[in-house]
Amino acid sequence: MGSFDRQRAVPKFKTATPSPLPLSPSPYFTMPPGLTPADFLDSPLLFTSSNILPSPTTGTFPAQSLNYNNNGLLIDKNEIKYEDTTPPLFLPSMVTQPLPQLDLFKSEIMSSNKTSDDGYNWRKYGQKQVKGSENPRSYFKCTYPNCLTKKKVETSLVKGQMIEIVYKGSHNHPKPQSTKRSSSTAIAAHQNSSNGDGKDIGEDETEAKRWKREENVKEPRVVVQTTSDIDILDDGYRWRKYGQKVVKGNPNPRSYYKCTFTGCFVRKHVERAFQDPKSVITTYEGKHKHQIPTPRRGPVLRLLGKTET
């Protein structure tokens, strides 16, 4: 075989040029106009791997399918979910939560802390129902001689607490230092020296006696006016003088007495009229619940609280 034949037997690769492969744009990625590769490197959308740590500012994006076209980058907003890794802040709602309802009576009573014990001695002389209010109003006056201070107390029927205390006038004396009434103590010293009975009539009465006396005060008073030269007239009952003072509008002194019968709380006060000094006015408070004691032998004469024996 000659050299020509050997040349013909060797395949000639360059004799037939293969057809060029068709070039088409990549269906997976197209550089949008106006963007550079550096812009895509900084974009968080390219780092979809779960091994990459989330950014504290951008968060994490789950793996998703991105659609592109020749005009640019198309992103399906429904497929992208933003997850914030920071814990949510729970702020108290100022609108949805109902406001707590305030108890007006309790707030007023607790803030003012009203109490009837103010250090002075009072005597209740009346009570009535005020128009426009369901709570009763009680009236008190100071028991100190020649003190005209009064007060009215409104008490809640529901809770039994004092809602309002209104004072009228001012005290012209210091507060009592003990539980004894100042007026009764002074009168007791005078009576002990004159009557010599040795009893301390200045002590406070028990709670039961005080309540019974207030109930008797609510009963209608009986006023008897007669003309006499003596101050105390004999009505059949026995009395003990426990006080005397000058009241407003009458220069003649008023004397106070109480029945000496055990368990009887009837009281009376005697004074001469301002217009007619010969006229004696006797006012009874309460009713006797016992019979008239047996009269003593001989004429009975009570003058200025003294009993003839």
UniProtKB/Swiss-Prot annotation:
Source species taxonomy: Eukaryota, Viridiplantae, Streptophyta, Embryophyta, Tracheophyta
Physiological role: Transcription factor. Interacts specifically with the W box (5'-(T)TGAC[CT]-3'), a frequently occurring elicitor-responsive cis-acting element. Functions with WRKY25 and WRKY33 as positive regulator of plant thermotolerance by partially participating in ethylene-response signal transduction pathway.
Protein's UniProt name: Probable WRKY transcription factor 26
Primary location recorded for the protein, binned into one broad class: nucleus
Subunit details: Interacts with VQ10.
Record InterPro entries: WRKY_dom, WRKY_dom_sf, WRKY_plant
Stretches the record annotates as Disordered: 1-24, 167-210
Ligand binding (Zn(2+)): 142, 147, 171, 173, 259, 264, 288, 290
Membrane-crossing residue ranges in chain numbering: none
Any Pfam family the entry gives: WRKY
Coiled coil: none
Keywords: DNA-binding, Metal-binding, Nucleus, Repeat, Stress response, Transcription, Transcription regulation, Zinc
